[in-house]
Design a protein with these regions (language model features):
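Eukaryotic intrinsically disordered, low-complexity regulatory linkers and tails enriched in Ser/Thr/Pro
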Residues: 1-13, 17-63
Length: 63
């Protein structure tokens, strides 16, 4: 789960396991596996970094 910011400047939490693709248009367009799309203010690099940080946190807890 990662915190992202909509174009309307509202923060929301996205389940990053459902991301199918990221595009810059110039905002970042996130397409989920169910076809739903989100436009966010973060760059693709920022979204990827947030996902990496989240995954490292989850996998380092030893579940």
């Amino acid at each position: 789960m990662v915190y992202l910011t909509t174009i309307g400047n509202k923060e929301f939490i996205l389940n990053c396991d459902h991301i199918e693709k990221l595009e810059e248009v110039p905002e970042t367009l996130i397409t989920l596996t169910n076809g739903k799309k989100y436009l966010v203010l973060e760059s693709t690099e920022e979204v990827i970094e947030k996902i990496i940080v989240f995954k490292k946190k989850i996998y380092s807890q030893g579940y």
